């Protein structure tokens, strides 16, 4: 099984499959095809349970992808409040700026997310 299957499981929230990959030796901090890490795909797709599992296995909460985007920024861009809340509770750095020069608070129009970031 390659990156395609691992990324599919992450994006679709198939926690059992993600666990199988990770417990089978997949590195939760490895840069996957596409220049992103598992945390980015989970944050992009609103998969908070997958995020929590990856963090429990040592995933870097502030890892930047090939564009300089962190998982928190990914979750903010996509409007995934539960993911933002989880990442903040686990210590995500909300001051990091993305390639557009905006931090997490500045990068979202979602008021519920803005409230979490204040």
Swiss-Prot record:
Q: Which SUPFAM superfamilies match?
A: Ankyrin repeat
InterPro entries under this entry? Answer: Ankyrin_rpt, Ankyrin_rpt-contain_sf
Q: Which PROSITE patterns match?
A: ANK_REP_REGION, ANK_REPEAT
Chief localisation class: cytoplasm
Listed GO CC annotations = nucleus; perinuclear region of cytoplasm
Query: Superkingdom of this entry's organism?
Result: Eukaryota
**Pfam families reported in the protein's UniProt record:** Ank_2
Gene3D superfamilies listed in its UniProt record: Ankyrin repeat-containing domain
Q: Which UniProt key words apply to this protein?
A: ANK repeat, Cytoplasm, Nucleus, Repeat
Q: Where are the ANK repeats?
A: 1-30, 34-65, 67-98
Where found, per UniProt? Answer: Cytoplasm; Nucleus; Cytoplasm, Perinuclear region
Does Repeat appear among the keywords?
yes
Which family is this sequence assigned to? Belongs to the myotrophin family.
Tell me, in a sentence or two, what this protein's role is: Regulates NF-kappa-B transcription factor activity. Promotes growth of cardiomyocytes, but not cardiomyocyte proliferation. Promotes cardiac muscle hypertrophy. Plays a role in the regulation of the growth of actin filaments. Inhibits the activity of the F-actin-capping protein complex.
**Name used for this protein in its record:** Myotrophin
């Amino acid at each position: 099984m390659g990156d395609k299957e691992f990324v599919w499981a992450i994006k679709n929230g198939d926690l059992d499959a993600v666990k199988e990959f990770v417990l089978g030796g997949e590195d939760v901090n490895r840069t996957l095809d596409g220049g992103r890490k598992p945390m980015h795909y989970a944050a992009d797709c609103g998969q908070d349970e997958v995020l929590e599992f990856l963090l429990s296995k040592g995933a870097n909460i502030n890892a930047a992808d090939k564009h300089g985007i962190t998982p928190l920024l990914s979750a903010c861009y996509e409007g995934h409040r539960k993911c933002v809340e989880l990442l903040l509770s686990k210590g995500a750095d909300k001051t990091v700026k993305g390639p557009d020069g905006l931090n997490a608070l500045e990068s979202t129009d979602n008021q519920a997310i803005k409230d979490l970031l204040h």
